[in-house]
């Protein structure tokens, strides 16, 4: 079988914290939403689908959420459950961009070709100032299920990178 390459994610940059006293949370019929009355949350240089955002200074929703879909520049849905909470106009809730996840991609096992060696490569780029240095962990995950649920995924051993910016290119075989 010919070698192929799949790019799961292009370049990502850190989004500066977004704060506002108009940020609210709603839970309606299994749809979990974070929105504001005027503070821009999404769009160029802001949050996007699959970003991880950590909420602080809210009454009931201080947690990390995965952006599921962008509804508008002032509203997005999340994967995780939120507790309905209205903005009080004086408490400034902060949304901190803490990372991102990528879409899932089908591997050769899905196509009944469970042989061969796989390589994952990470390129960590420091753009020159301390506000964008990557300092964290990247994990490759896999599943043996042909129609996986969230619980079917596992970390692939030997492919986890914890970066301190001393080396910027990493490759792992599995």
Predicted features, each with a name:
Residues 132-154:
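Short, surface-exposed beta-strand/strand-loop-strand elements in extracellular ectodomains
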């Amino acid at each position: 079988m010919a070698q192929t390459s799949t790019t799961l994610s292009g370049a990502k940059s850190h989004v500066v914290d977004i704060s506002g006293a108009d940020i609210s949370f709603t839970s309606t019929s299994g749809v979990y939403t974070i929105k504001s009355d005027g503070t821009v949350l999404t769009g160029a240089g802001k949050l996007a689908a699959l970003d991880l955002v950590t909420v602080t200074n809210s009454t009931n929703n201080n947690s990390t959420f995965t952006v599921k879909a962008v509804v508008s520049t002032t509203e997005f849905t999340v994967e995780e459950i939120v507790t309905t909470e209205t903005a009080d106009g004086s408490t400034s809730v902060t949304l901190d961009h803490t990372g991102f996840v990528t879409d899932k991609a089908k591997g050769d096992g899905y196509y009944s070709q469970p042989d061969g060696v796989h390589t994952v490569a990470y390129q960590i780029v420091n753009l020159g100032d301390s506000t964008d240095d990557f300092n964290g962990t990247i994990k490759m995950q896999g599943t043996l299920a042909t129609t996986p649920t969230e619980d079917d995924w596992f970390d692939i051993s030997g492919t986890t990178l914890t970066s301190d910016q001393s080396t910027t290119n990493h490759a792992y075989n599995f």
